[in-house]
Amino acid sequence: MKTSEFDICQKNGVKDIVGVMIGYDGIVLAQNKANAPLNITLTQLFLALAKEVPQNGKLVPNPYTKWSEIDKSLPERKIAVYGPPSSSGTRDTIEELVLSKVSQNFKEYGAQQGKYKSIRQDNAYIPSGENDNLIVSKLKADKQAFGLFGYGFLASNKDKINAANIDGVVASEQTIAANDYKLARSLFIYLNAKNPQTLDFATLYLSDDLASGGGELEKIGLVPLSSKDLKAMQAHIKKANRLNSTLVKAGKVF
C-alpha cells in the first residue's frame, strides 16, 4: 500500500486496516517458445519501453524500432511488447521496477531521475487489457512479439512460451522468493478489521492447505511464502495487528 492510499483510507474513516502478505509474483518478459532463449538486461528493457531515452546528453523520443538497435547482442526483431493497461497493478510494478529504477542511472531525466514512469505510446508497447490469456494468444500468433505479465501465466503456459532471463537470472519460484530476480514483487491484501468476516477470509486464504508450498494457490501460479513466514503471517492475522503510517512507509504489515 502506498502512503497516499493509506491516507485516503484514513480520511474516509477506514482506520482499522490489517495488511496481509500472501506470497510473491514476478513480472516476466515472455515470447513464443519457438524463439531461442534470450538474456536481456534491465537497462535494455527500459530502453525498449521508455517514452523518452537519453542520447547525446539529452532526452529524445524513443527512436528504437528493433531490439538490435538497442544492443547488437539482441535479436533483429521489431520491438512489439504486449502488456497491461495503465489501470493495472502489474503496469504500476513495471513502471516502478523498470522505468523508475533504471532512470536513476541517467542524469538526463533531471527532476524525473528515479521517478520516470512514462511508457512509449507509438505502438511498440501495446496495452492488452486485464487479460493475460489474451497476451499469451498474441505471442502464439506473433513469434516476433514479447509479452509482459505475471509469472503464474508463464508457469501454466510453458508448452507455448518461454521467458527472457533478466540480468542473467531466470524467473523461477526460487529466484522470485529470494528477490534475486529483478522483477519480483510481494503480493498483499488489505482488510477492514471492523468486518470480522474479512479476517475469516484471510485465515482461510493463508491456511496450510491453500497457501503453503504445494498448496492450491501454488498450483495456479502463486509463489508461496516460506513455512516460517507463513506461520508468522497466520499469527499476525489472529492478532489482527493494525496497519499504521510507519509500517506503510517501511513496506511492512506488522
Regions found by a protein language model. Give the residues of each.
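Flexible loop/hinge segments at secondary-structure junctions
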Residues: 1-254
